[in-house]
């Protein structure tokens, strides 16, 4: 890390008014920080910067000399309403033309203490965040401008597709505005696991929502393509069963579900426990939790509940648009179903469907690797993929060899 840090420099602060001082360790969490609140009007275009402040990039072990900006900007929620969120914008010292990487951390949060903007400024950390901070440092060392959005939004709506994609695309717009860059500036997007949600959805909705952005390549790994398939896979899984109540919290926030109408007493108790946690806390805390234990009669599964199924169907990847940029899609394959949490056949199915629509897809399957083990392999291949895309090199589509995978049809 020390070698990387020596290669990095300071971000330029542009003309957007600075709201307050650099938020270092000891700063309030975003939920209690006035910087994140906006009580003004939102009759402005998505991606408009509403306020900014300087920040210092801090790793889990030390501060760095890298400075950047946090920007509060307008974006759009799942229902199409105007909302705000924050992105972190970091600039390299390495000279050369500006190339933007929108990096989407897998913060998988129900509480704001895990927001990337808070983590990157030294507010909190975890092993997952630490690994991703090292990846971000690598992109900066390679000369990329890096934008890291809090894509779950103010309400921490985890896995919600369109909203996450909107936040990612508007974060790029906000960074371009802050740095006074033209919309023709080349942009790549990358994210793994939870970070694949804004990445894939951003690529899918960009042609309609942000057609002016110059997306040159998108890399997404470990994707939750259709959660109707993931729920039975993680039910009773000692490592991942805790994601089930967390998903219900996210759906309640995004869709206003009436939890008392279908959640069991035990389910309500667990939901209350995970309500403000992040994945490092809740994923493996409930090794005996099952899908069936979360619901009450007359239901035997969350997939029996029409409101839950409707929410899941609204977030099936590949269902609401077609990317117009080369895609790198990857997944581990540790057992006959998937990587222990993501479904290999679902990622195959998404890649195959995109190929059928004319998308240039490079698919990678990491046989024998779990979800966690596949992360560093994916990140290395993503860097190579994006480096080639920014350089204008040839693509390496393997559409002709991608299996059809699973059908991605709505459950309802």
Short names for language-model regions:
Residues 25-33, 39-40, 224-320, 341:
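Accessory cap/linker subdomain of secreted extracellular hydrolases
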Residues 1-21:
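Secretory targeting and sorting signals
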Residues 323, 328-335:
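Short beta-strand/loop motif that positions the catalytic acidic residue
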Residues 364-367, 376-412:
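Catalytic active-site module of serine/aspartate enzymes centered on a nucleophile-bearing elbow/loop
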Residues 19-96, 355, 410-412:
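Catalytic-loop region of hydrolases
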Residues 86-91, 97-121, 137, 218:
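Short beta-strand element of the alpha/beta-hydrolase
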Residues 173-241:
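Primarily recognizes the serine-hydrolase "nucleophile elbow" in alpha/beta-hydrolase
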Residues 131-135, 158-180:
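Alpha/beta-hydrolase active-site loop
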């Amino acid at each position: 890390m020390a070698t990387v840090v020596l290669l990095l420099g300071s971000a330029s602060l542009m003309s957007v008014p600075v709201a307050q001082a650099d938020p270092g360790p000891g700063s309030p969490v975003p939920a209690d920080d006035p910087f994140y609140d906006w009580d003004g009007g939102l009759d402005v275009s998505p991606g408009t910067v509403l306020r900014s402040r300087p920040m210092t990039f801090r790793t889990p072990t030390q501060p760095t000399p890298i400075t950047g900006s946090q920007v509060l900007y307008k974006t759009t929620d799942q229902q199409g309403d105007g909302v705000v969120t924050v992105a972190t914008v970091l600039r390299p010292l390495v000279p050369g033309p500006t190339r933007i990487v929108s990096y989407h951390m897998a913060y998988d949060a129900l509480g704001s203490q895990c927001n990337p903007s808070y983590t990157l400024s030294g507010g909190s950390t975890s092993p997952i965040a630490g690994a991703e901070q090292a990846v971000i440092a690598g992109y900066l060392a390679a000369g990329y401008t890096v934008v890291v959005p809090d894509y779950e939004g103010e309400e921490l709506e985890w896995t919600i597709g369109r909203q996450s994609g909107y936040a990612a695309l508007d974060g790029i717009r906000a960074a371009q505005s802050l740095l006074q860059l033209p919309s023709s500036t080349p942009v790549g997007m990358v994210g793994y696991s939870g970070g694949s949600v804004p990445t894939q959805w951003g690529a899918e909705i960009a042609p309609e929502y942000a057609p002016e952005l110059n997306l040159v390549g998108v890399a997404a790994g470990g994707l939750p393509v259709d959660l109707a398939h993931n729920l039975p896979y993680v039910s009773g899984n000692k490592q991942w069963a805790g994601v089930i109540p967390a998903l219900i919290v996210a759906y309640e926030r995004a869709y206003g579900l009436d939890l008392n109408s279908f959640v069991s007493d035990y389910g309500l108790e667990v939901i209350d426990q995970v309500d403000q946690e992040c994945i490092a806390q809740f994923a493996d805390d409930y090794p005996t939790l099952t899908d069936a234990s979360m619901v009450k009669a007359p239901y035997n599964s969350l997939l029996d509940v029409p409101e839950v199924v409707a929410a899941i169907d609204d977030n099936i990847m590949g269902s609401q648009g077609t990317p117009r940029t080369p895609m790198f899609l990857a997944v581990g394959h540790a057992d006959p179903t998937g990587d222990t949490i993501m479904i290999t056949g679902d990622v195959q199915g998404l890649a195959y469907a995109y190929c059928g629509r004319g998308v240039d897809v490079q698919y990678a399957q990491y046989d024998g690797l779990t979800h966690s083990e596949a992360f560093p392999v994916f990140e290395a291949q993503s860097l190579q993929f994006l480096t080639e895309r920014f350089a204008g090199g040839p693509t390496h589509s393997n559409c002709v060899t991608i299996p059809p995978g699973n059908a991605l049809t709505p459950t309802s």
